[in-house]
C-alpha cells in the first residue's frame, strides 16, 4: 500500500492565485503516478441568469452563455495542467456552493488528496465572507493541500523538490 494518493482533485477558480495550485497538483500527480481530476464550480446564482442586471438593450447573460464561460475557464485550467507537464484524467464542472460541490465530488471520486488555492484574504474579510478552502479542509474526507500564492510567487514551478523526500 502506497502512502501517496491514487487520485487527486484539483479545485480551481481560474484566478491568478490558483496558478501555483495548478502547478503543484500537476507536479504531485506526475511524481506519484496519481490520476488528476480538475473541478471548477460556479455559484448557482451565476448559472440561473442572475448575472448583471439588464441595461437598456443589452440583455442579461443567459444560462447557456454563463455555462459556456465556465466551461472555457475549466478548459483553460486543464490547459495549464498540461502546460505544467500534467495529465488530466477528467474535468468536472460544478454548479452551487463551491465548498460543498468540491467536498461531494472528492467523496464521489474517492480521491486521496484535494489541492486547492487560497487567496490569502485578511482576517475581517475572511470572517465575514468565509473561505472555500477553510470549509473544504473542515469537511473533506481526505487530506487537503491548501496552496497559498505569495506576492513573490515563483514563476518556475512549485518547488516541490524542496518539499518531498527523494
Region locations from a protein language model:
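Short, well-ordered secondary-structure micro-motifs
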Residues: 21, 48-51, 103-104, 126-128, ...
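Short, flexible loop segments at boundaries between secondary-structure elements
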Residues: 142-150
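Small/aliphatic-rich secondary-structure junction motif
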Residues: 2-57, 152, 161-166
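A short acidic, glycine-rich active-site loop
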Residues: 57-72
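Glycine-rich, Arg-bearing micro-motifs that act as flexible, cationic patches
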Residues: 113-135, 153-157
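Structural beta-alpha unit
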Residues: 1-4, 17, 79-114, 151-166
Amino acid at each position: 500500500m502506497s502512502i501517496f494518493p491514487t487520485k487527486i482533485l484539483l479545485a480551481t477558480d481560474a484566478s491568478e492565485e490558483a496558478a501555483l495550485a495548478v502547478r503543484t497538483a500537476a507536479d504531485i500527480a506526475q511524481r506519484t503516478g496519481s490520476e488528476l481530476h480538475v473541478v471548477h464550480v460556479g455559484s448557482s446564482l451565476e448559472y440561473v441568469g442572475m448575472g448583471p442586471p439588464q441595461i437598456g438593450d443589452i440583455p442579461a447573460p443567459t444560462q447557456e452563455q454563463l455555462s459556456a464561460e465556465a466551461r472555457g475557464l475549466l478548459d483553460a485550467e486543464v490547459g495549464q495542467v498540461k502546460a505544467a507537464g500534467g495529465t488530466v484524467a477528467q474535468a468536472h464542472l460544478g454548479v452551487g456552493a463551491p465548498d460543498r460541490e468540491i467536498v461531494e465530488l472528492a467523496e464521489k471520486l474517492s480521491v486521496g488528496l484535494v489541492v486547492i488555492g487560497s487567496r490569502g484574504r485578511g482576517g475581517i474579510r475572511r470572517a465575514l465572507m468565509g473561505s472555500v478552502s477553510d470549509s473544504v479542509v473542515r469537511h473533506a474526507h481526505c487530506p487537503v493541500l491548501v496552496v497559498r500564492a505569495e506576492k513573490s510567487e515563483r514563476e518556475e514551478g512549485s518547488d516541490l523538490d524542496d518539499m518531498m523526500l527523494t
